[in-house]
From Swiss-Prot:
Source organism of this protein record: Bos taurus
UniProt KW Zinc-finger keyword: no
Lineage: Eukaryota, Metazoa, Chordata, Craniata, Vertebrata
Purpose of the protein: Controls cell movement by regulating actin cytoskeleton homeostasis and filopodium and lamellipodium formation. When unphosphorylated, induces cell migration. When phosphorylated by MAPK8, induces actin bundles formation and stabilization, thereby reducing actin plasticity, hence restricting cell movement, including neuronal migration. May be involved in coupling the protein kinase C and calmodulin signal transduction systems.
Extent of Basic and acidic residues compositional bias: 76-85
Primary location recorded for the protein, binned into one broad class: cytoplasm
Lipid-substituted positions (N-myristoyl glycine): G2
Keywords: Actin-binding, Calmodulin-binding, Cell membrane, Cytoplasm, Cytoskeleton, Lipoprotein, Membrane, Myristate, Phosphoprotein
Protein name: MARCKS-related protein
Pfam families: MARCKS (PF02063)
Mode of membrane association: Lipid-anchor
Binding partners and assembly: Binds to filamentous actin (F-actin), but not to monomeric G-actin, independently of its phosphorylation status. Interacts with calmodulin.
Location of region: Effector domain involved in lipid-binding and calmodulin-binding: 87-110
GO molecular function: actin filament binding; calmodulin binding
């Protein structure tokens, strides 16, 4: 960027000196534009009407804009900044079951509006509940899988896992898991149907 002195017509006259010598710039004009900060009249002593109208017209009609008295809600907002409002804790709801570091989290269907710490068990309690739930579901799944092996293949995998967790009948779940996985019907989802029902 060039300096103002290099653009001056004469090398010995600077831009500041040229601004001081020019009568147009004394009035607050800069680069062809009038600068106005507050009072526009250079005299300041004489009474001059405002630029947007006359003072008598505004005073005679009585339409002066006054701030409305604040309501109680507005007073509270004025005294307390809006960022200091207490934030409500958002409840997190599971839409799909997922596993995190070996723990599976399922959606709970509790309708109670109790405390969030009471409604959501800790990880240890949830793990204990998962193991017992897998044991109960495993026996029911094995019976269903034996009756209809084609439609229950996704459940057979869950039954195999629960049987392994029980340490019991793995022979019954083994042949069903060895069958090719061609799920028939609307259950093309890899998640077991028991997890979808809960």
């Amino acid at each position: 960027m060039g300096s103002q002195s290099s653009k001056a017509p004469r090398g010995d006259v600077t831009a500041e000196e040229a601004a001081g010598a020019s009568p147009a710039k004394v009035n607050g004009q800069e680069n062809g534009h009038v600068k106005s900060n507050g009072d526009l009249s250079p005299k300041g002593e004489g009474e001059s009407p405002p630029v947007n109208g006359t003072e008598e017209a505004a005073g005679a009609t009585g339409d002066a804009i006054e701030p409305a008295p604040p309501s109680q809600g507005a007073e509270a907002k004025g005294e307390v900044p809006p960022k200091e409002t207490p934030k409500k804790k958002k409840k997190f709801s599971f839409k799909k079951p997922f596993k995190l570091s070996g723990l599976s989290f399922k959606r709970n269907r509790k309708e109670g509006g109790g405390d969030s710490s009471a409604s959501s068990p800790t990880e240890e309690e949830q793990e204990q509940g998962e193991i017992s739930a897998c044991g109960e579901e495993g026996t029911a799944q094995e019976g269903k899988a034996a009756a209809t092996p084609e439609s229950q293949e996704p459940q057979a995998k869950g039954a195999e896992a629960s049987a392994a967790a029980k340490g019991g009948d793995t022979e019954e779940a083994g042949p069903q898991a060895a069958e090719p996985s061609t799920p028939s019907g609307p259950e093309s989802d890899p998640a077991p149907a028991s997890e979808q029902n809960e």
